[in-house]
Amino acid sequence: MIGMRTILEVADNSGARRLSCILPRGGDLGLRAGLGDVVTAAVKEAAPDSAIKKGKVVRCVIVRMRKETRRKDGTYIRFDSNAAVLINDVGEPVGTRVFGPVARELRDKKFMKIVSLAPEVI
């Protein structure tokens, strides 16, 4: 699960490199977030020529998580890293590319644009 101060990698080409979660919204009374949950995060590292600068507060959706997640069919899914994709106020991705696989749970949570940009859906 993604909690407060968790470091997230950015899985898109928006210009941010690393994020720190400052407000998870999801299960456990809003204290932790899982796959497909929207969180508020602060940019810790950014590319030098990007529009998104270090210190900016952004919204993002969790696309990969190290902690295993149980699916309804009884299987478990786990990734090698904690990663997120930056989204705007409407819920569409800020970047135009998504790097690495994303979880199938994003399709259930109506993030179809992110799913279509991803090279692989697991």
Swiss-Prot record:
Keyword RNA-binding attributed: yes
SUPFAM superfamilies with a match to the protein in the record: Ribosomal protein L14 (SSF50193)
GO cellular component: cytosolic large ribosomal subunit
GO BP: translation
Protein keywords: Ribonucleoprotein, Ribosomal protein, RNA-binding, rRNA-binding
Pfam families assigned to the protein according to its UniProt record, in alphabetical order: Ribosomal_L14 (PF00238)
Gene Ontology molecular functions: large ribosomal subunit rRNA binding; structural constituent of ribosome
Keyword rRNA-binding carried by entry: yes
Subunit structure: Part of the 50S ribosomal subunit. Forms a cluster with proteins L3 and L19. In the 70S ribosome, L14 and L19 interact and together make contacts with the 16S rRNA in bridges B5 and B8.
Protein family: Belongs to the universal ribosomal protein uL14 family.
Role of this protein: Binds to 23S rRNA. Forms part of two intersubunit bridges in the 70S ribosome.
The name this protein goes by in its record: Large ribosomal subunit protein uL14
